[in-house]
Amino acid sequence: MAILQSFLLLLSLPFLFTLIYTKKMKESKRNLPPGPAKLPIVGNLHQLQGMVHRCLHELSKKHGPVMHLQLGFVPLVLISSSEAAEEALKTHDIECCTRPNTNAARVFSRNNKNIGLGAYSDEWRELRKVAVREYFSVKKVQSFRYVREEENHLMVKKLRDLALKQSPVDLSKTLFCLAASTVFRPVFGQSFSDNKHFSEEKIEELVFEAQKSLTFKFSDLFPIPGLGWFIGFVSGQHKGLHKVFIEVDNFLNHMIDDHQKQNQPQDRSDIVGSLLDMIHNQEQDKSFKLTIDHLKGITQDIFLAGIDTSAITMIWAMAELVNNPRVMKKVQDEIRSCIGIKKERIEEEDVGKLQYLKLVIKETLRLHPAAPLLLPRETMADIKIQGYDIPRKTLLLVSAWSLGRDPKYWKNPEEFNPERFIDCPVDYKGHSFEFLPFGSGRRFCPGMASAIATIELTLLNLLYFFDWKLPEEMKDMNMEESGDVTIVKKVPLELLPVLYH
């Protein structure tokens, strides 16, 4: 087998060098953005060891806010300034709003039948309309308010018991379970803890394994007929990708089967039930027909992207608050003075009174965007950004992480200081290009309203009912990062809750 692999590699080398030479000749005629020197074949892959968003940030400080790299045979442009981001995501949004055709995108999008990874098309636009109407609209988010309130109440009861025992809490796990619970009931019609097919631990593992599978693989970087497939086959990347996808698909099949066995009447309140009713009752002559694969695509987006991103933001917020006692005291003083000290249960309407809490969340999103490089885009036409040529089929990354730390826009950018947003018009809704935790343009995250509602209410509950401190054996908070598409706190957040009342 090793001899065969070596023989095939030798056969491909002349072809590879011919492609490299041809590509170099074409590039020499274009005004490409600056970037680091590239090695033959691998390009700049050797410079992206470790946390990729940090590697790219350091390179961009040297080469500029519009930077060109080569990953294997795939050209990449990194955007890390507000002006360049506005050109890419607003001026040229229509030319930059598709996704790269990676192995993971093809598999997990079910051939472009979901929103997050699907290519831009008429089908994608129709599917997004359905998803927004059934789950992501402000009206729908408000209709699920009772779920968020009930799940937070259950979380507080469990934390009370632990506080009475003076027992430390793994807040990373607690907040993942809370985020999952607020998704499971509206989407699948059942509690996260009551799932009879998968344990809580298995679902958590599945979410993180799926996120890891969505990263660029070595085989994606050599999109030459046969070569990419060969690399993926020999390395086992294809096998690993399909294994995770099959597990996700099995989970969704179980959820759908449970609904189909219930024989409930129409107008079911959860998303799976509503979409099944739409599939069964849709007009046959419509140009866009919703299918089971579309249903899986929508629910998979919510399941994989909606749980860990909200949990990640809440974890970082609590970590920063414990690290910054001044901010912790100020936000708790606001909460307790506005709400009083005798409330047994927090309601979502209480959030509207709390301006400093909202600033804390903004500052957390600035320093710790859950997806620091957003999701990759691909140019569908030749464009110019900041005067540089960006050819068609170029991978485009926007570093929300770098934008949030740029001293050009933020004073003392590494400091956790919510007051910076007082009387500041900058917001996270996609129109302030120095602050893009949810992206912008046609690929703006549709789950923003749902995520913010969950984050605000959960932090309010944690900060109203409890004081928080490090366990006695811990001297300092470890703030190291870990992850790929999303960036989590490397060491789980363990804190000691102290009952306030």
Swiss-Prot record:
Parts of the chain that traverse the membrane: 1-21
Positions annotated to bind heme: C445
Amino-acid biosynthesis found in the keyword field: no
The protein's required cofactors: heme
GO cellular component terms listed in the entry, alphabetical order: membrane
Keyword entries, A-Z: Heme, Iron, Membrane, Metal-binding, Monooxygenase, Oxidoreductase, Transmembrane, Transmembrane helix
EC number: 1.14.-.-
Pfam families: p450
Record keyword Heme present: yes
MF terms in GO: heme binding; iron ion binding; monooxygenase activity; oxidoreductase activity, acting on paired donors, with incorporation or reduction of molecular oxygen
UniProt membrane topology term: Single-pass membrane protein
Chief localization: membrane
Protein location: Membrane
Superkingdom of origin organism: Eukaryota
Family, per entry: Belongs to the cytochrome P450 family.
This protein's name: Cytochrome P450 71B25
Source organism (scientific name): Arabidopsis thaliana (Mouse-ear cress)
